């Protein structure tokens, strides 16, 4: 994976490129398989299991040069060991765009979604509307490291968890987040303000 882009490589040299978007799903089941659910765009069958991919934003076959073009367009992925965070910082420090937009721009840094955006910036005391050029290297390093830590936890538990000590088994994500879609800041008890950045919900405590 590179951020939100999933890549399946085949012996032919081609690659299957998947971006699930907001509504796409990956379903894995043992063979023999039950009847498929919904509109299946791709079914990958192995010796013991199969994978169905439903409703992705992107579902395409890439040849080698197309795959390389895609990878070159994607910013460093906070979860990849070979990621170079300096590439993201170089773009951020030159930008007038708000940091809340920049860290969700997959060409700047890859992997951060909408809930993580508000949570990471709140945890690091950074207002989402702060222009990129006002983010110094130390602040960016904190954002990057927190993003990597939280996304690693998310992968391990298959759940978004940004509250220290929260249980992954809880079905209600509101119990696992600090300010996203909430009314009151857990730290200062001040009112959480909701607004939009690039037509996506964002949350901030301004006290």
Label for each model-derived stretch:
Residues 1-207:
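Structured catalytic/nucleic-acid-binding cores of DNA maintenance enzymes
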């Amino acid at each position: 994976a590179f951020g939100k882009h999933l890549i399946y490589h085949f012996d032919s040299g081609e690659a299957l490129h998947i971006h699930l978007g907001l509504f796409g799903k990956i379903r894995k089941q043992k063979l023999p398989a039950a009847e498929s659910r919904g509109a299946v765009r791709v079914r990958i069958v192995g010796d013991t299991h199969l994978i169905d991919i439903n409703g992705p934003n992107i579902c395409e076959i890439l040849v080698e040069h197309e795959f390389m073009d895609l990878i070159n367009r994607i910013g460093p992925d906070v979860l990849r060991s070979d990621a170079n965070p300096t590439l993201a910082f170089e773009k951020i420090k030159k930008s007038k765009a708000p940091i809340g937009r920049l860290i969700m721009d997959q060409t700047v840094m890859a992997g951060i979604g909408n809930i993580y955006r508000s949570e990471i910036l709140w945890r690091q005391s950074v207002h989402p509307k702060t222009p990129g050029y006002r983010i110094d290297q130390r602040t960016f390093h904190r954002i990057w490291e927190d993003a990597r830590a939280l996304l690693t936890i998310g992968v391990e538990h298959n759940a978004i968890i940004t509250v220290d000590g929260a249980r992954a088994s809880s079905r209600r994500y509101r119990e696992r987040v600090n300010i996203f879609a909430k009314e009151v800041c857990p730290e200062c008890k001040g009112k959480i303000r909701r607004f939009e950045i690039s037509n996506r919900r964002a949350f901030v405590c301004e006290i």
